[in-house]
């Protein structure tokens, strides 16, 4: 009886193992195929910057304002929040959730709103100061 239960649990993880194996094999396989199938050119003109037919002057590197990074970090944080909220809302709509889960989600949302208000008060969301 215990062996039957264990085999059922192991069988339920077979799709996860397959997904993990494919996920680990595909990136190196793709990189290998790109390296083997891509055209190769040793011409020096392939490594220069193209500027509408004119000869490039100076370097292509520029310094970005640090404010752009603040926007990027804020976007990533709020995007990850949505990734946590969407499955919760789907389960809540489909099956219903206990009141403790609702309280936990409100605490999570409160922490997110606190972070948003903090960014707003520090004027991190102001584009031009």
UniProtKB/Swiss-Prot annotation:
Q: How does activity depend on temperature?
A: Optimum temperature is 39 degrees Celsius.
Q: Name one GO biological process term.
A: methanol metabolic process
Q: Does the keyword Ribosomal protein apply?
A: no
How this protein's activity responds to pH is stated as: Optimum pH is 8.5.
Q: Which residues cross the membrane?
A: 9-29, 64-84, 95-115
Q: Where in the cell is it found?
A: Cell membrane
Does the entry feature the keyword Transmembrane, yes or no? yes
Q: Output the Gene Ontology cellular-component terms.
A: NADH dehydrogenase complex; plasma membrane
How does this protein lie in the membrane?
Answer: Multi-pass membrane protein
What are the GO MF terms of this UniProt record? Methanosarcina-phenazine hydrogenase activity; NADH dehydrogenase (ubiquinone) activity; reduced coenzyme F420 dehydrogenase activity
EC identifiers of the protein: 1.5.98.3
Catalytic EC class:
oxidoreductase
The UniProt catalytic activity note for this protein reads: methanophenazine + reduced coenzyme F420-(gamma-L-Glu)(n) = dihydromethanophenazine + oxidized coenzyme F420-(gamma-L-Glu)(n) + H(+)
- InterPro entries, alphabetized: NAD(P)H_OxRDtase_bac/plastid, NADH_UbQ/plastoQ_OxRdtase_su3, NDAH_ubi_oxred_su3_sf
Keywords tagged on the record:
Cell membrane, Electron transport, Membrane, Methanogenesis, Methanol utilization, Oxidoreductase, Transmembrane, Transmembrane helix, Transport
Domain of life of the native organism: Archaea
As for what it does, the entry says: Component of the F(420)H(2) dehydrogenase (FPO complex) which is part of the energy-conserving F(420)H(2):heterodisulfide oxidoreductase system. The membrane-bound electron transfer system of the complex plays an important role in the metabolism of methylotrophic methanogens when the organisms grow on methanol or methylamines. Catalyzes the oxidation of methanophenazine to dihydromethanophenazine. It shuttles electrons from F(420)H(2), via FAD and iron-sulfur (Fe-S) centers, to methanophenazine (an electron carrier in the membrane).
Name the family: Belongs to the complex I subunit 3 family.
Tell me how this protein assembles: The FPO complex is composed of at least 13 different subunits. FpoA, FpoH, FpoJ, FpoK, FpoL, FpoM and FpoN proteins constitute the membrane sector of the complex.
Q: By its UniProt entry, which HAMAP family does this protein fall under?
A: NDH1_NuoA (MF_01394)
Name of this chain's protein: F(420)H(2) dehydrogenase subunit A
Q: Which organism is it from?
A: Methanosarcina mazei (strain ATCC BAA-159 / DSM 3647 / Goe1 / Go1 / JCM 11833 / OCM 88)
